[in-house]
Amino acid sequence: MSDVGEIAADRLKSFVERIERLEEEKSGLQEDIKEVYSEAKGTGFDVKIIRQIIRLRKMDKADRQEQRAILEMYEEALGMTE
């Protein structure tokens, strides 16, 4: 293999190994997150609601407000408001 080919192969191998390490870390983090959800559930918190809160916290404030307004409009249209 030429020097250029060896360099490209080395870089490719480096990228693949980095991705593999990150995938392993990601897997470990997902297990940690799962444990935290289990702990919260064991304490009496509703995990579905916690997941919704986390999703909402990731959103921009304007997007959250828009989503809430649309939800309220749909609830009214379906006669679900009190």
UniProtKB/Swiss-Prot annotation:
Classify the source by domain of life: Bacteria
The entry's keywords: Plasmid
Q: Name one Pfam family in it.
A: GapR_DNA-bd
Q: Which residues cross the membrane?
A: none
- Molecular function terms, GO-annotated: DNA binding
> According to its UniProt record, which protein family does this protein belong to?
Belongs to the UPF0335 family.
Q: What is this protein called?
A: UPF0335 protein pRhico085
